[in-house]
Amino acid sequence: MNKTDLLNSIIRIDENRLLFNYTMFKTIIHPDIYMDLIQLIFQQNDTILQTNAMYDVVVDFKGLTMTGVERYKGFIIALSDEGQRNGKNFLQKLGKITIVNPPFMVANVGKILLPLMDKSVKEKIILG
């Protein structure tokens, strides 16, 4: 499998949704390819927005642990920085974020933080 195929196994398009597979992410990702994956995410997002006004994100967190959160913090920061840099208003065009198989910690943190969030943001997050 080449690098493009590997990256496409982490994140793919399904209609107007970006589907993120953490199980594949953790087996493939390395700091050397963070920007390749981030570029793919934004390319796929652009593809969706060519035919849809909004997009959704589905994240399958099966197997995520606190160690994993700490290990991939650099990727999350790089993704956030690039999103702010590109100025394409992706957050305004985001419909819903569905979190599938949330680990215990995510579900519990979500229960604490969701009541404190702005209603417009809170309505976009679905813990399932």
Specify the residue positions occupied by each region the protein language model found.
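SEC14/CRAL-TRIO lipid-binding/transfer domains and related phosphoinositide-recognition modules
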Residues: 1-96, 100-128
